[in-house]
Amino acid sequence: MRPAVVLLGVLALAANLRAALAGYPPLLETVRADLGLSAAVAGLVQAGAVLMMAVGSFAGSSVDARFGREQALGGAVALVGVGSLVRGVPHAGTLIGGSILIGFGIGVAGVLLTGVVKEHLAARAGAATGGYVVAMMIGATVSSALAVPLAVLLGGWSWSLAVWAVPALLATALWAPIAARTREPAAAAAPPPADGVQVRRLPWNDRLARLTACYQAGTSTMFYGWLTWLAPYYDSQGWSPQRAGLLLAVWSVGQIPAALLVPALAERRRRWRFWASLMLASATVGTLGALALPLPPVVGPWIWALLISFGLGAGFPLGLAVIAWRTPHGAASAATSGLALGIGYTAAGVAPLVMGVLVDVSGYPAAIAVLLLAAAVQAVAIWRIGDRGE
């Protein structure tokens, strides 16, 4: 199978790995009012999805071994579509249940995508990783921008959430023939697992795996914390839901150039620590700005959102790219990313819930402080990972 065809399929699947999640925050206040939910319970919807992403990430290497990487990848994205359909029923139970299915599918798919890139697109792993993360961001941008208009057009917030089943199932159908043609050649060509990294076991004793887990915990906490609470935060500042949803869409768009360019630059220059540190600094400055000066004259919120998005846009793919660069083959990449993403998503799943509780109890400043703590954890991990050859 030609690498370009595999890349096309990967991009189609990846576009669905944030769309279902990003469509919920602009509707969060509407959902709360309609279903009578507290901020903590409304945050649990997103937290449940992200925690199930952690479960899916931990299970990813076992799913890879049992069902085959390419076939399991298609099935995981199909599960995202099914979960979106379940969320089309306007009830708190189905909202949470559908989010659980979506989260598990995203978690498994994220691990398997790293292995597919290592196996079929290893020559340009940094660019390929940046490309599929950009596809994820485009999906998130479209979803967040259209969430409120779709709710108005289709007659309710539940329809706006359910509609994202369509692209997920279409992408699965596109991937099916690619998976059928790539599975056997890939299996025949794959080298045996390296010492200490087994397909069915997570590499807890591996230094890179542990450090990238800490890194992903920091960047994922910041990403999903802002994804869940950026629009509601500015709702609380007096913005309309449409304007807050547009800010979230701009936040998503701002991630795209960083995700596309920075991993490739880091790969070419062999300066992973420099770029990771620069991106973390951008996200931290934006977070501090949003906390200290949420509504300075005219353009302030947009500047903070773009600084945050630029830093987080490159932060996530840099964490995946360093795994692809420093692991010997696809099985090792899947196992290492499974541990890193599992730990990262566990932290990120707890963060929106904790932030929701803090919003109810103390207000948004205490909630945003959680994100600054995550930035400190990420900074330590960046320093310890270092550059290649250290």
Q: Model segments located where?
A:
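Conserved MFS/SLC helix-loop-helix module at the cytosolic interface between two early adjacent transmembrane helices
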Residues: V55-G93
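Helix-to-loop junctions at the C-terminal end of transmembrane segments
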Residues: G56-G68, A258-R271, V359
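Helix-loop-helix hairpin linking two adjacent transmembrane segments in secondary transporters
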Residues: A92, A123-R124, G131-R183
